[in-house]
UniProtKB/Swiss-Prot annotation:
Residues 1-145 form the N-acetyltransferase domain. It comes from the Bacteria. Its EC number is 2.3.1.82. This is Aminoglycoside N(6')-acetyltransferase type 1. InterPro entries: Acyl_CoA_acyltransferase, Aminoglycoside_N6-AcTrfrase, GNAT_dom, YpeA/RimI_acetyltransf.
Length: 145
């Protein structure tokens, strides 16, 4: 297995995996992907097996308060996706470890993430990667008249 940073040359592979994780339009994904590639505090990794992209990870450095953490800045897992045939093979663990090494370069001592309340598959994955649940939050909004 080979893990490498995403680049302009790997946009097609990254987009294919990203579409499986988040259901935005291709144009929206591509616009955000180009922005992320230029962002100093963003990391995008792709894992390959036999020249096929099998997993992706997106992480960032967050300087604002991150729920459940005690320090700042914090490495933050924005998203991770592994093709079903390659799950439970250790690829997600390898991606997370590389993201943690990257986050340490920014003096991070914590790595955080979030998941929807009803996404129990994501909760299980986070636990298997060493994350601990810290709190549950429900966000509210209201239109101002």
């Amino acid at each position: 297995m080979n893990i490498k940073p995403a680049s302009e040359a790997s946009l097609k592979d990254w987009l294919e995996l990203r579409n499986k994780l988040w259901s935005d339009s291709e144009a929206s994904h591509l616009q955000e992907m180009h922005q992320l590639l230029a962002e100093k505090y963003a990391l995008q990794l792709l894992a390959y097996s036999d020249h096929q992209a099998i997993a992706m990870l997106e992480a960032s450095i967050r300087f604002e308060y991150v729920n459940g953490t005690e320090t700042s800045p914090v490495g933050f897992l924005e998203g991770i996706y592994v093709l079903p045939a390659h799950r439970r093979s250790g690829v997600a663990t390898m991606l997370i470890r590389q993201a943690e090494v990257w986050a340490k370069q920014f003096s991070c001592t914590e790595f955080a993430s979030d998941a929807a309340l009803d996404n129990v598959i994501s909760h299980a994955m986070h636990r298997s990667l060493g994350f601990q649940e810290t709190e549950k939050v429900v966000y509210f909004s209201k239109k101002i008249d």
